[in-house]
Amino acid sequence: MAGGKKKTATKTQKKKNQSQIKVTEEIYALIAICVSLIVMFSLYTDKAGYLSVISRTLLIGLFGIGAFFIPIYIIYLCTKLFLFKREVLFSRIGLGITIALITSVLLIQTVNINDYYVQGSIWGSIKTIWHSQSEWHGGVVGFLIVLPLYKLVGKIGLFVIFVTLYLISSMLIFDYNLVSIRNFFGGFKEKASKVKFVDKKYEKDDYINLKKKDGASEGNKESKKDDISEDNNKIKILDFMKNSSLNDIEDNKKEKDNQLKDNIKINDFKQESKMPRDLSLDNTIIEQRGFNSEKAKEEESIDKEISNNIASKGSSVGASYVAPNADLLNLNNNNELDKDDKKALLANAAKLEETLMSFGVEAKILQVTKGPSVTRFELQPKAGIKVSKIVNLADDIALGLAAKGVRIEAPIPGKSAIGIEVPNKEQTPVFFREIVESKEFLDNKFKVACALGKDITGKAVVTDLSKMPHVLIAGATGSGKSVCINTLIVSILYKYSPDEVKLLMIDPKVVELNVYNGIPHLLIPVVTDPKKAAAALNWAVNEMTRRYKLFADNGVRNIESYNALYNKGEVPEKLPYIVIIVDELADLMMACPHDVEDYICRLAQMARAAGMHLVIATQRPSVDVITGVIKANIPSRISFAVSSQIDSRTILDSAGAEKLLGRGDMLFYPVGESKPQRVQGAFISEEEVEHVVSFIKESQRDAQYEEDILEHINSATIASEGNGDGDRDELLDEAIEIVVESGQASASYLQRRLRIGFNRAARIIEELEECGVISRRDGSKPRQVLLSKDELENMK
């Protein structure tokens, strides 16, 4: 105990001594600052009495013009060393300023050395300096430093030394190196060669050049701002409104004329066209569509040729089917980027770099791509910076850019860059006609092509449903889910005849898909009753089984091989692809969850090779609707805006969908991809759908529905309503007799009487309740038997 008390007392005594030392140091520092202020006052004025005369004579005699800076330095050192407890006396900038001041004092002494130097007498020179009435010299100390060097290297050698010292001080103050000086003065040729290489590399893309701002007069700005403005001249700006084959020739012509003029590149797209034109546009003028101009007439004629081209392609696939033309769809008259938009993008790029720099993240923006709904900034972080550090700054970046929210794609697949997606102030719609007229839609040879929209670069996104092979679509109300389903259906109507693709539509909401009733692609009218929907899925399972039996009998493995036999005349029947579209899965799961889940899982597991594909949509992506079994068997996903990150993880197995903007903004996650792709869904209005459907109905024969399917659905529905759906337990009749005779009903009672497990007994109790034999459960009260013995005898 005594030893512990001694140790405590020793520690306390040490702390007291340290505090006393600190107080003493601070007192000395305050005294030194006070003396320095008095000396500085006496140097700068002549109102300090004898002290002014003494200090001026002593300090100016020793240090010359440098004496005026000595009190300031003493105050600086005392404040930093004793009051703020800084161990490092001089920072990089402070050291540079000190070197510059000392060099200036020595330079003044060198310039005036002949006025104070007495030949052959150093002491006489010192006396001359001491009694000089001028302050423009280096004092005795400066003279003793300069004189040996003057004798050694001469005045020219001293000037070389001073220039070197000034260069060192400027490097410390402004934080640059000799390599940056070389790049600034001699690196223009290297930059021009790099620009030429980038232009050649991207010659196939549709870039046009902006004129570079003349920034030569801004060379004396702060180095940080100079770096940002220099980087802006290297940023490639891509606009989704200029990615069109309609403007391929003029864009390529402009690109060749301006290859080395600018470092900023832009990619827009307008109406895509398959008819090339040789039009010359002025580099600074963007011509818009006008109804009274010759250009408008020419574009209208081209649009008609496009429509005829689409119709001819559609009519070639089916002898009796005439595909609708593009004139039934609305045109997109949105304009390209103007100069103000480009300036705003560059300003946001600079602001993004500054925001990241403020958090210690040094990164360089390589490219800015403006999409329909978001603008993506592609940045490359400096080596050694973790990607997770940038990802964690999402909210801070949104605050710095005054954005609703940002989505960070780290890294961008196929690029050594990180994508920061910032919402546009105004969302630009993508019209369905743009996708229909794109070469991605016209020239593909997909088995079941489905148009989705455009990605962030303006490229049309068209997928092959036969490769997916099933897709799950989820999104909150109003996010664009129903429009996406309409684009999928209408793209099939534009591309394929009824002999090639058949549709089976299930619409529990009744009003979404009823417009398609009467088209020849439908197997049966749109199913709206949930119980009939389960029966329709049951028919699909039976059809899948029948097709596999046909494949086995003919020695083939899939629908392509079987139809190849039909083309050779070896089999009598051609099998069309069947696309099963379910518009609201949640309602079906509430009505008959077990049947729907079982049928969907069987189709998802086996229907691909049979040419049957599922498109399932829901506005409630919760785990009780999209079960684990359904998710495991449907690999491709499309997610629109959802309300929470939990819903996003349910549909995509990752976060991100909660940050979508709605109105068609989607994440497309096809099978085989490592990350989802952001797509702006194509918009098709109800009027456009009605025009397309009316055209098909008028130009084709009346729809001939499959009567066998309708009979199967009706019979299955009746059997289900009559409890003859195959799920009835074989012990149910015996259980009814036991319950009626005993007058009591419980799972444990049936378990003992029938000698079965508890789970099976509980299911039998549920069936008895559905049949009306026993009452519903009422808390802890026993169930009542509602069927009497006489009624049971009459039923027999």
Curated annotation (Swiss-Prot):
Which loops or segments lie on the Cytoplasmic side of the membrane, by the record?
177-796
Q: Can you say what this protein is called?
A: DNA translocase FtsK
Instruction: State one molecular function term (GO).
Output: DNA binding
Where do the TM regions start and end?
23-43, 58-78, 93-113, 134-154, 156-176
The compartments listed are: Cell membrane
Q: Which GO terms describe its biological process?
A: cell division; chromosome segregation
Q: Where is the FtsK domain?
A: 458-649
Q: Show the GO cellular component annotation of the record.
A: plasma membrane
The record's keywords, sorted A to Z, are: ATP-binding, Cell cycle, Cell division, Cell membrane, Chromosome partition, DNA-binding, Membrane, Nucleotide-binding, Transmembrane, Transmembrane helix
Membrane topology per record:
Multi-pass membrane protein
Q: Which family does the record assign?
A: Belongs to the FtsK/SpoIIIE/SftA family.
Residues binding ATP:
G478, S479, G480, K481, S482, V483
Query: What function is annotated for this protein?
Result: Essential cell division protein that coordinates cell division and chromosome segregation. The N-terminus is involved in assembly of the cell-division machinery. The C-terminus functions as a DNA motor that moves dsDNA in an ATP-dependent manner towards the dif recombination site, which is located within the replication terminus region. Required for activation of the Xer recombinase, allowing activation of chromosome unlinking by recombination.
Upper classification of the source organism reads: Bacteria, Bacillati, Bacillota, Clostridia, Eubacteriales
Task: Write down the PROSITE patterns for this protein, in alphabetical order.
Answer: FTSK (PS50901)
The answer to whether UniProt assigns keyword Cell cycle to this entry is yes
One Pfam family name is: FtsK_alpha
UniProt xrefs under InterPro entries: AAA+_ATPase (IPR003593), FtsK/SpoIIIE/SftA (IPR050206), FtsK_4TM (IPR025199), FtsK_alpha (IPR041027), FtsK_dom (IPR002543), Ftsk_gamma (IPR018541), P-loop_NTPase (IPR027417), WH-like_DNA-bd_sf (IPR036388)
Q: What is known of its domains?
A: Consists of an N-terminal domain, which is sufficient for the localization to the septal ring and is required for cell division, followed by a linker domain, and a C-terminal domain, which forms the translocation motor involved in chromosome segregation. The C-terminal domain can be further subdivided into alpha, beta and gamma subdomains. The alpha and beta subdomains form the DNA pump, and the gamma subdomain is a regulatory subdomain.
Kindly state the subunit structure of this protein.
Homohexamer. Forms a ring that surrounds DNA.
